[in-house]
Amino acid sequence: MDMTLPIALLIDLMFGEPPAIIHPVVGFGKVIEFFDNKYRRRSPYLDFLVGAISSLVVIGLAFILSHLPNFLPNPFNLILSIYLLKSSFAIRSLHDHVKRTITPDLEEKRRAVSMIVSRDTKSLDEPHLNSAAIESLSENINDSVIAPLFYYLIFGLPGAVVYRAVNTLDAMIGYRNEKYEYFGKFAARLDDLLNFVPARITVLLFLSLGGRKVIRYYRMAKYKINSDKPIAAMSAVLGVWLEKPNYYKFPGRRPENEDIKRALKVYWIIVVEFLLIVAIILYGG
């Protein structure tokens, strides 16, 4: 029996993320940051071309890194495989980051939320801060748990590591603004492609908790290709509105501190559901 995934999961649940200085995802980020800082924007065509090449360099490095265990003897190949696989998902870290947003202190909440969302939190009131925390948790159920393990099931370690590299690229340069509109377009579209199936699997996992209401809210999620789908499902299950002002809003009552706690309970149910499915696929036969 291949113990790579069980040990990687155990390490994640016990210790969380490895130090930034040795974290592959941080390394991927530094490589794309280097290209981003060096390249001066010129034209839509050149910006797209340079952005695509820069992204492919990072993806190539991730692919090579994921194959390094094949060239190492036992037990070093297993150790590196476990380390790389664990680095591709973040179950405990996601929980811990969101848990820090559960506080009655508005400024402390604002600081905690600013660590997990890209939007400006300075002008957000408490309900919108609560919403932002729950939205981030919902979106990252897919990005940080379901999708990397989905690609591990299909393609093994390279699938998980390459997915994490693409997701990191999207998080850093996949924005619709003047600086990244074309430079980050390749990374953003590739991330959309890779997340299409996992995001919908994530929604299916919510059905055990919300049934038809999840389906109804899923049909409302027409704002983005993937990321709003798990957010809609979480809104349906919790019965609270989740809103990114000027982008989307799913109906419900006002989200409170207690709803972040409830969202974390939902998170663990979804994680356990998916891990059971993964275990059956990998070890059931």
Swiss-Prot record:
Task: Tell me yes or no: is Cell membrane among this UniProt entry's keywords.
Answer: yes
Q: Where in the cell is it found?
A: Cell membrane
Chief location:
membrane
Checking InterPro entries in the record gives: Cobalamin_biosynth_CobD/CbiB (IPR004485)
Biological process annotations from GO: cobalamin biosynthetic process
> Which pathway?
Cofactor biosynthesis; adenosylcobalamin biosynthesis
Record keywords: Cell membrane, Cobalamin biosynthesis, Membrane, Transmembrane, Transmembrane helix
Its membrane topology:
Multi-pass membrane protein
Where are the disulfide bridges? none
What's an example of a GO molecular-function annotation for this chain? ABC-type vitamin B12 transporter activity
For this record, the Gene Ontology CC terms, alphabetical, are: plasma membrane
Membrane-crossing ranges are 10-32, 45-67, 145-167, 266-283
What does this protein do, in the record's words?
Answer: Converts cobyric acid to cobinamide by the addition of aminopropanol on the F carboxylic group.
Q: Family membership, please give it.
A: Belongs to the CobD/CbiB family.
Protein name per its UniProtKB record: Probable cobalamin biosynthesis protein CobD
